[in-house]
Design a protein with these regions (language model features):
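Conserved P-loop NTPase architecture
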Residues: 1-160
């Protein structure tokens, strides 16, 4: 007989944004190469997806922490970092998602393939090529990626 789980507590975290790069163009016979640092990639998001083939939280009960990937760092030659991979958590229809810290209902999953963004990934940092201007033609400034967002959640399955 299969196990039926209708309430579960989990932690979800989005991914950090990647850092922007500080880099300058260096080539043979190019004496003064300008700034060419790329931007960092965005961190991965965490989504909940309604699935009418599921009837309990048995599939996700073994894993208590879901973390999306970090965005890649920028590189020279204006190469932007790769965006972090998203995580999609399939839940049965009728799932209530409640933030444990605030005890507030975030959302309800009521339809098949209904997708809810729960934790948005951090924004990627800017490379020094972005900060180039007529007054500052060789900026040594780049920004770090934004931090991730984490939530402790309680998932309740209500009968439909």
């Amino acid at each position: 007989m299969s196990e039926y789980i209708d309430e579960i507590a989990i932690k979800v975290s989005s991914g950090n944004g990647g850092d922007g790069a500080t880099s300058f163009r260096r080539e043979k016979f190019v004496q003064y190469g300008g700034p060419d640092g790329g931007n960092g990639g965005n961190g991965g998001n965490v989504y909940f997806l309604g699935n009418n083939n599921l009837s309990s939280f048995k599939d996700i009960s073994q894993k208590k922490y879901f973390k999306a990937r970090k965005g890649g760092n920028g590189k020279g030659s204006k190469k932007n970092g790769k965006n972090g991979e998203d995580i999609i958590i399939a839940v049965p229809l009728g799932t209530e998602i409640i933030n444990i810290e605030t005890n507030k209902l975030i959302c309800e999953v009521l339809k098949h393939n209904e997708k809810h963004l729960i934790a948005e990934g951090g924004k990627g940092g800017l490379g020094n090529a972005i900060f180039k201007s007529s007054k500052n033609q060789a900026p040594r400034k780049s920004t770090s990626g934004k931090d991730r967002v984490s939530f402790n959640l309680n998932l309740n399955l209500k009968s439909l």
